[in-house]
Amino acid sequence: MKRQRGMALLSVLLVLTLALLLVEGLVRQQRVTLAATTVYLDTLRLRQALLDAEVRMLAELPRWKNSNPGVVHSRQPWAQPHAWALEDGTRLQGSITDLAGRFNLGWLARPNGRARFERLVQALELTPVALPEGKLLTWREPSQARLLPEVTRPWLARFSPYVAWMPEAGRVNVNTVPAPVLASLGIPLDIARRLEDQAPAEGYATVQAWRGQPGLQGLPLQANDLAVGSRWFRLALTARNGQRRLRLVTDVELAASDGRPRVLRRWIRTIDDEAPAP
């Protein structure tokens, strides 16, 4: 009789143990599901905040007067950093970059594109890389340079801020171009640095005025590659709420007819997973 009671007690204890394990597993699964749902909802809120901020930043782009593009330079309001906060505590930071001030990856398809690329790499004091011979390069992203064996992550991080892809119509904006990109055009680096440092606050009104600067006479610069304005810009936005952070990068083209902005490409990613900026 006592043996039967002992077996019954063991059975009850076994059932209770299994029940507790089952409940513990369900609670753990619920916590994981709740945490994942919280992350998902937080990410959705940050994503929407970024898209709303994108609309706000688009309104900051240079405006055309009477459907005519004007001078674009880095001291205008669009080029200043932006920061604001939302009622839910989300903090947003944004900046706009003139892509016409960068090395155009579309040049790599030109006969002189490789020489320009090599001069840019030299001006940035990077390890020289060998571009594939006899092959038309159609890079659209700086990250495609990773296909080259000499390119490392630090190399790419240094290279990326100076390059972008634009259509063939994209010209270098002499009012926003940094010295290394000027050097890629065949301008000695010391002269390029002086041009960058001594640029007038209001920008150059014409390419001819820029070409009249000391040191540029006699250099084989192609007028069709130069401009004092731009139609291509990059918006970079960061949203932060607590430990959650998202980054949005948007490339924008202004229509040739009236300057109306059109989104070309858009990236959204968590900052922790972020590769070198596009």
Task: Please provide the spans of the model-predicted regions.
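Compositionally biased linear targeting/interaction segments
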Residues: 2-278
